[in-house]
A protein has these predicted regions:
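Glycine/threonine-rich beta-strand-loop-alpha-helix active-site module
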Residues: 131-154
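Contiguous, glycine/small-aliphatic-enriched amphipathic segments in soluble metabolic enzymes
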Residues: 1-139, 182-267, 271-285, 289-301, ...
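Conserved hydrophobic/aromatic beta-strand scaffold that supports enzyme active sites
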Residues: 143, 154, 163-165, 294
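Flexible glycine-/small-residue-enriched beta->alpha junction loops
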Residues: 81-82, 150, 157-158
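A generic local secondary-structure boundary/capping motif
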Residues: 152-155, 196-198
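Ligand-binding beta-strand-loop-alpha-helix segment within the catalytic cores
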Residues: 156-186
């Protein structure tokens, strides 16, 4: 790599969705390629096809390369990976589009693991069309969990709200069985750790949502709050995690109580994402607690508007900004903790790090 700017790997996503449209619109602004070195994994042919369908994107000019090591400063670099010919059927879920998305993802993750890129930003995929004998994952998060180190947590981020999820892509009927006191305590510990290292929050305050309506109404609507969630919050607090709750989700968001906390832990997918997307439509999906940084825009393939020049690129921009910020915060955190200053315990009235001064014994003249 020819410069020291952060190398942002970006995957093309589903080629029949809005992935390429938001990528092209993002990098039509030349300032984006000045703040980082973008390395896009996908098909240059598909990129050209979508560019020709869009207006006001003359600034998008790409540099074709064979490997990330060839990426040039100030250029929008594209690595041609995946099938040489990808049939484009705008707005449709096809196996070909799914295969192209997976090929780009695998190539980018390989480079991420080998240090060829610094962070990863993924355009949306269709989880169903991405399935194959070689790819049996229900989403990016599950695939990254298998490829990278750490226990990932799906986390939605914006300037006003951060939401971590206890459970991700499982049926609602299985959520109650998937949570336990121990798992919630561990999730709170991981959430605290990522808020400290990745968001530079010294002592984050975390709100924990209830599972049942009205936080169970004292056990009338479910006992998970009494038997699992509240004990977990108490134990986490004893372990120096500033956790509070459980709070009934509807009132918590409707009242604006979320503004008092640095993050929220939701028990299941829609409990966290529905209010988040309402409050922060241009938010970012961050895979927390992994060894590498990965973000994505907070939207799906959007087949209904694909190819119509209607997609808003702001969430993609925010995903790139977030990846860069998190990478920098994590690097500073590592530097601060690499050689901490030696700490001495003080007893009241004296410094035990200093030897007591002994006066010479008095002698008679």
């Amino acid at each position: 790599m020819s410069d020291n700017k952060i190398r942002v790997g970006i995957t093309q996503g589903d080629t029949n969705g809005i992935g390429w449209e938001v990528i092209i619109k993002t990098f039509a602004d030349s300032r984006m390629a000045e703040m980082c070195t973008p390395v896009i994994y996908g098909s240059p042919k598909v990129a050209t096809y979508y560019k020709n369908r869009l207006s006001d994107v003359e600034g998008f000019v790409y540099n074709p390369i064979q490997s990330a090591s060839q990426a040039r400063r100030g250029k929008v670099n594209i690595i041609d990976c995946g099938p040489s010919e990808i049939p484009i059927e705008i707005g449709k879920a096809t196996a070909a589009a799914g295969a192209a998305a997976v090929a780009a993802l695998k190539a980018a993750v390989k480079d991420l693991k080998e240090g060829e890129i610094d962070v990863l930003v993924t355009a949306p995929i269709n989880k169903e069309s991405a399935q194959s004998d070689e790819f049996r994952y229900t989403g990016h998060t599950e695939f990254l969990a298998a490829e990278l180190e750490g226990e990932p947590m799906m986390m939605m981020c914006s300037e006003v709200l951060r939401v971590g999820l206890m459970t991700i892509h499982i049926p609602l009927a299985e959520v109650s069985k998937a949570i336990s006191k121990e798992k919630i305590v561990e999730a709170l510990r991981r959430l605290r750790a990522t808020l400290r290292s990745d968001f530079a929050i010294v002592e984050p305050r975390i709100a924990v949502l209830a599972l049942n309506p009205h936080a169970g109404d004292g056990g009338l609507l479910g006992k998970e709050e009494q038997e699992v969630i509240r004990p977990a919050v108490q134990e986490a607090f004893e372990q120096k995690v500033l956790a509070f709750g459980p709070f009934a989700a509807d009132g918590f968001f409707a009242s604006g109580a979320f503004k008092k906390y640095d993050a929220v832990l939701a028990m299941y997918h829609d409990q966290g994402l529905a209010p988040f997307k309402t409050i922060s439509p241009e938010g970012v999906n961050f895979t927390a607690a992994l060894s590498e940084v990965r973000t994505s825009p907070d939207h799906g393939v959007a087949y209904d508007i694909a190819g119509k020049d209607l997609a808003d690129p702001q969430s993609m921009r925010e995903a790139i900004y977030a990846a860069i910020d998190i990478f920098e915060n994590r690097r500073r955190w590592a530097q601060m903790n690499a050689n901490p200053l030696q700490h001495f315990e003080r007893e009241k009235g004296r410094d035990v790090s200093v030897h007591d001064l002994k006066l010479p014994e008095a002698t008679e003249d």
